[in-house]
From Swiss-Prot:
It comes from the Bacteria. It is an enzyme of class 6 (ligase). PANTHER family: LEUCINE--TRNA LIGASE, MITOCHONDRIAL, LEUCYL-TRNA SYNTHETASE. It holds the Pfam family Anticodon_1. It catalyses: tRNA(Leu) + L-leucine + ATP = L-leucyl-tRNA(Leu) + AMP + diphosphate. A motif ('HIGH' region) lies at residues 41-51. It comes from Cereibacter sphaeroides (strain ATCC 17029 / ATH 2.4.9). This is Leucine--tRNA ligase.
Amino acid sequence: MSRYDPAATESRWQAAWDAAGVFTARHDPARPKYYVLEMFPYPSGRIHMGHVRNYTMGDVVARQKAAAGFSVLHPMGWDAFGMPAENAAMERGGHPKDWTYGNIADMRAQMKPLGLSIDWSREFATCDPEYYGQQQAMFIDMMEAGLVYRKNAVVNWDPVDMTVLANEQVIDGKGWRSGAPVVRRELTQWFFRISDYAGELLEALDTLKDWPEKVRLMQANWIGQSRGLQFAFSMAGAPEGFDRLEVYTTRPDTLMGASFAAISPDHPLARHLERHDAEVAEFVAECRRVGTSEEALEKAEKKGFDTGLRVRHPFDTAWELPVYIANFILMDYGTGAIFGCPAHDQRDFEFATKYGLPIRPVFLPEDTEETALAEAFVPMKSERVHYIRGFAGAEVQTGEEGVAAAIDFCESQGVGRGVTNYRLRDWGISRQRYWGCPIPVIHCETCGVVPEAKENLPVRLPDDVSFDVPGNPLDRHPTWRDCTCPKCGAKARRETDTMDTFVDSSWYYARFTAPRAATPTDAEEADYWMNVDQYIGGIEHAILHLLYSRFFARAMQKTGHLPAKAIEPFNALFTQGMVTHEIYLTRDAAGRPVYHLPEDVTDGRLADGTPVEIIPSAKMSKSKKNVVDPMNIIRQFGADTARWFVMSDSPPERDVEWTASGAEAASKHLHRVWRLADEISRADGEANAEDGALDKATARAIAEVTQGVEGFAFNKAIAKLYEFTNTLSRSGAGAEAKKRAMRTMAQLMSPMVPHLAEEVWAMLGGEGLVAQAAWPKADPALLIDDTVTLPIQVNGKRRGEITVPKEMAASEVEKLVLADEAVQRALGGAAPKKLIVVPGRIVNVVI
């Protein structure tokens, strides 16, 4: 009997697939297409089990769709620009390009042994000049379409990475990569007009039926549509040019509870006061040490500076409110100015309490009297409340009704207008770093800002740069920076900012349709392959990458690079769970944790016998060393074992805990399948009565595995394959029936364990490669059960069940029921008073 040896067989089948060009995507108008894509990785240098799970999911889908007759596009590339490469250059010497391409080579070498059905001929990295040159061409097209602009802006500045961060890249007030506290700084920045699409991006979420509801909700909240009132306070004693203070509020129904007005430190009025008042300047400088994101402002201590200025209430000019500069007001949301109603906003309540300002309730819960508030009363807008200082609508109404009535009333009185605003702000893409896509514009003293001529693209990054000091090396590279104006030929200066790396990943899915085209996309190829039918990646990308990609698809459609049908680029989205592992640690003399790799721990002890603390499973982390190297698993068990385990142990949307015992169990099962196939390949039994039962079991396996794979219930598909293996091993059917079933088994398990499937397919005489075989179809007639299981009740209590042919006569069923041991015990030798057979449903025995 031969022995299953993954190390010897897996590479052989991978070579066979490559030689046959099995996974080369083919534009075939005669066949339906299917585009499956996993979010491409950053080339850190090592793949991890999370990568294995993610890419195996996509591979299962791609292989099954190809077998089902689709022309499949399943590409791979590298999200290759970014700070880690520059950091590596600074820490270790060398060049970011060498570090990046070296890591790509290492990761490709680790991924290929997994046997993924990837069309490697379409591979690219975003740091390839051929890729970012097309990105530069699109940037110029977007400039011409009015989707790009440049302005001075207060930005989040990372003082360690020395670059600007988008609000989404500020986590808990710190840079998402460096972890350094961000500060506010004013710089001239390039922006994409994503806010122009806010309403469309929000509304279109309802069309994404095959996206997780959680992702759609996260995007809706980030876009943040609100309906409110925009109006102007008149100012008392204001500096010249500031006689009105424009305010936006989502709660105009609380105007009669106003006790102060507040402006952003970046508001024009605050800027004016800053130039003329040292105390204001000091306060504003303090405010700028907090990031610009809402999250950073929310967590900072709320502080204000009384300017001494006053505004007049729009309904009572004798009623004046103090004007504060407040550190929690955003300049680029609304108008950068608000009025505070402390009774109905907790932030305003804390501010008013701190500065001794009045707190006047506007509404109360129904059937309550006005009393001093210990905290703000902030009911849901859908809740009915009693307005005691209302000015529009009913005395008792919901907050939603109160807001609508207040807007209508204010508009009728000439106090402002109803406005729809969005939380989503324009996307600042300027980054002060080297390892990114150069922004293709030139600054000329005569012509101003001029786009680079397209025939000069790509604007390549220079190789001869130094990272011996922080900051952007492009600023210190005169032969690259200094150039001539493409418009007038005069001396000019190249833009030294590079693009946010999220730009690179916002359109790569479109480039895969024609990765060698001389334009960003090829119209014919994009029309055939777009949209991505199935996109797979982590939910951590719900806002940044996925929202930016949706915007970019619209921008590409507007500039002629994508067809209208691709305005939503991803038809279906699946967000997979993580791969987790226990954490092993000991402690040093100071009690600090010292982490250990799983392979260094056996039965809870290190090699020297030292016991370890075991922390329950958590996300795999290099710092905590609870990582499993996929290459070790492949060397020990084979790629198919790794693939089988990450697919089998948990629903794919949930986390899966990697355990050595689980991997061993997966390996044992695959060895069992091999032995079963080897045994069946040598069987010679005659056809017999059990052949039909095995054919029916095979049909059920086809139906249920297909349903599991197509429904992303891979664990259920694998559970059915376990069951089918047991059925086949116990079957007494003849040799041909068993061989037929085993060949079907090879086809069904091919998406999950493709190497073993090829071995089994070849062993059982399958024609060609199973990777090129058509997906099996279940005979509908074999899916119809010809038996039925009937529960037996005696005096209303269930006593057992009986399985009988569906067409068995009631009289024959009665005989079998009366012969049942449980029924005989209940009867105690007596005859039943009544025996009722409800065909196909139940049998009732009355004693």
